[in-house]
Amino acid sequence: MTKAIPKIGSRKKVRIGLRRNARFSLRKSARRITKGIIHVQASFNNTIITVTDPQGRVVFWSSAGTCGFKSSRKASPYAGQRTAVDAIRTVGLQRAEVMVKGAGSGRDAALRAIAKSGVRLSCIRDVTPMPHNGCRPPKKRRL
């Protein structure tokens, strides 16, 4: 005789065989490339670094959250530095262009870490979007 299929509303819990920190084991190994583009996106809450090949296809990405930082520590310069080192070490770049976007605190630290890592930088571009008097900015915070 076949087993009865449990209903959606049944009280019996089904355990899935995933560990709590399964995020690190599920990540694919990054392709090794020698030349690429490093995109640094530094917001006021986080720093995200994406490494792409010269055609723009994503090879690897890293953020302060994936490096183990939580809450307000993700916005620190040290988190930006660790994120950059993690991304470059994994991919193994030798020559790269850097495109920096945003005005967060991890921006300069990530740029310094990239420069010290031994990667030959062909150019550093600031691609922060600047409005030509577009939308009204949000109101100032009152603390």
Curated annotation (Swiss-Prot):
Belongs to the universal ribosomal protein uS11 family. It comes from Zea mays (Maize). PANTHER family: 40S RIBOSOMAL PROTEIN S14/30S RIBOSOMAL PROTEIN S11. Its main location: plastid. GO terms for molecular function: rRNA binding; structural constituent of ribosome. GO terms for cellular component: chloroplast; ribonucleoprotein complex; ribosome. One of its GO terms (biological process) is translation. HAMAP family: Ribosomal_uS11 (MF_01310). It holds the Pfam family Ribosomal_S11. This is Small ribosomal subunit protein uS11c. It is found in: Plastid, Chloroplast. The keyword rRNA-binding applies. Keywords: Chloroplast, Plastid, Ribonucleoprotein, Ribosomal protein, RNA-binding, rRNA-binding. Part of the 30S ribosomal subunit. Signal peptide: none annotated. The keyword RNA-binding applies. The gene is rps11. Coiled coil: none annotated.
